[in-house]
A protein has these predicted regions:
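N-terminal leader/targeting pre-sequences
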Residues: 364-503
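Predominantly soluble domains enriched in secretory-pathway, periplasmic, or organellar proteins
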Residues: 14, 19-404, 415, 428, ...
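Gram-negative bacterial Sec-dependent N-terminal signal peptides
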Residues: 2-20
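Short glycine/proline-enriched turn or capping motifs at secondary-structure junctions
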Residues: 6, 337-346, 491-496
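Generic low-polarity alpha-helical segments
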Residues: 1, 15, 28, 484-485
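Low-complexity, intrinsically disordered regions enriched in charged/polar residues
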Residues: 5-9, 243, 421
Length: 503
């Protein structure tokens, strides 16, 4: 009798637990799927480009649980014998929420990670510089946008072996699927055209003009009616009909370094959340009339974004702050942040990523399953050097401290040197500029060029450099202090500083 009662309770628990991850009424699921309340079984995963890690966060208390270390920082990753991953960047997950696919751009790899054990179960190497990967709605295939070439690599959803390639315009940026499972939408990072592909036979059935070439991210509404994509080079976000003839519906001026977009359904309606890296904000738009309804300050260089299984929160990776921010979608304000690795890029929220512990009982038949301490944290490592970075701002000379600085800078520790990443805004479009070190805070004195760059049509740029820069700009170890500045022109012919360092 006792055994029968135990089995009955276990069966009920198993059935309810299975129902939780059968689907969700949030992206990338269908509107008809049930919402999944936030629980300790859920995970937020962020892909970190410079530490080559995946950080794992518990969304209930916004606590970093640890990292999955896929590779090493400099200088180890420069070795000819290096076998780890490089430039960990893109991310997707399977329909059963038991596998995440993590793309490493520099090593041309897709890493398939078991969410229960945090262990890599397979690595598939594809073509040059893949950017993002996602599973089809039935989980039978994984489509990888190979941005350094002109095709989508289609992998078997079970063996992860490449089964075919779909030729698309040069530089595919990302693929997302219609929640009804019919179409794959592929935007481009090098060609001003998005294509629509039938999942069943891999045929292009629609073409949508992009306002500019650089699309990094794309999202579909749960009702399969709209597709939103960002344009990082021009600071725009575009919307087209998710069904034939795939007509363009709207072009929005969202702001410099428009990064990622995702869709949220909650008690107030359905909304698109767009991360604006150059403004350090998330902008919120209604999907029915495209009205902007909120602007949410987030922190430095918001990038990846994904909703919780019930739409009550969205999570945002802060690329130049090495944090994940949690946003309450009913209040549209940041309610918590947690530390992650260096330069988080793509981010996903996976409901029920960790199965309930064996024998766990769904107390009072609620949706909050019991997850014992330490369950689902195997193989995770502490941040270590992945958590070491410094940040500063650049602003026009004479700007007051209370004025918003247009440029954020992050210095990610890599041994004795750092990777510098500057999210530059507030400059003239399409002009050459120089990031330099000056002997004077005003940007005068002796100048040492660091990196030249060209601004995009939105007057913005992402600028990178490597060196012992933190030690120099802080005057550490008795090193004569220098100051980061931006000047118009080139190393050989430049004007006076237009932005100078501000702590």
């Amino acid at each position: 009798m006792k055994r029968s009662a135990y089995l009955a309770v276990l069966l009920v628990s198993t059935v309810l637990g299975g129902a939780r991850y059968a689907g969700a009424g949030q992206a990338p699921g269908a509107a008809s799927d049930p919402d999944i309340p936030i629980s300790h079984q859920d995970r937020v995963y962020s892909a970190e480009q410079y530490s080559n890690t995946v950080s794992v966060t518990d969304p209930v208390d916004n606590k970093l649980l640890g990292t999955i270390r896929l590779g090493d920082p400099l200088p180890a990753n420069l070795s000819p014998l290096y076998k780890g991953q490089l430039l960990v960047h893109g991310m997707g997950f399977s329909p059963d929420h038991r596998t995440i696919a993590v793309v490493a751009i520099g090593s041309n790899a897709v890493n398939f990670i078991d969410t229960a054990t945090n262990s890599v179960k397979h690595v598939t190497y594809v073509g040059r510089s893949p950017h993002e990967a996602f599973f089809t709605r039935d989980g039978s295939e994984v489509w990888v946008s190979v941005r350094g070439e002109n095709y989508v690599s289609v992998l078997d959803g079970t063996t992860y072996a490449e089964k075919t390639r779909i030729t698309v315009p040069n530089g595919p940026g990302m693929t997302i699927f219609s929640p009804d499972g019919k179409y794959g939408y592929v935007c481009s990072s090098f060609t001003p055209e998005t294509v629509v592909i039938t999942v069943a036979d891999h045929k292009i059935v629609g073409r949508v003009p992009q306002a500019s070439p650089f699309c990094p991210n794309i999202a579909a509404t749960p009702d399969s009616k709209q597709v939103w994509f960002t344009l990082k080079d021009t600071g725009k976000t575009q919307v087209f009909d998710g069904q034939p003839p795939f007509a363009l519906l709207k072009t929005l001026d969202t702001g410099p370094i428009s990064n990622h977009v995702n869709i949220v359904r909650n008690a107030n309606g359905m909304f698109a959340y767009v991360t604006i890296g150059g403004l350090n904000e998330v902008k919120v738009f209604r999907t029915d009339n495209f009205e902007q309804v909120a602007t949410i300050p987030t922190g430095k260089l918001p990038h990846g974004i994904w909703p919780s299984g019930d739409g009550t929160r969205v999570y945002v990776g802060l690329e130049n702050e090495d944090k994940v921010a949690a946003i309450d979608t009913l209040k549209n304000e940041v309610i918590a942040t947690s530390p992650v690795g260096q330069a988080p890029q793509a981010l996903v929220y996976v409901p029920d990523a960790v199965p309930a512990a064996s024998g766990a009982i769904n107390s009072a038949m609620t949706r909050m399953m019991v997850v014992p301490e330490g369950h689902g944290t195997s193989n995770l490592q502490p941040l270590g050097v992945a958590g070491q970075s410094a940040q500063l701002w650049l602003a026009p000379p004479g700007a007051k401290k209370e004025e918003k600085a247009p440029t954020s800078v992050s210095l990610s520790d890599q041994g004795l040197v750092q990777v510098l990443e500057a999210a530059v805004t507030g400059l003239e479009p399409g002009k050459p500029y120089l990031l330099a070190l000056a002997t004077e805070p005003s940007g005068t004195g002796v100048l040492e060029p660091v990196q030249g760059f060209m601004t995009n049509p939105a007057g913005a740029a992402i600028v990178n450099a490597i060196g012992p820069i933190r030690q120099v700009v802080r005057g550490e170890d008795k090193i004569p202090r220098r100051y980061l500045v931006i000047l118009p022109g080139t190393p050989d012919n430049h004007g006076a500083a237009v932005q100078v360092q501000r702590e």
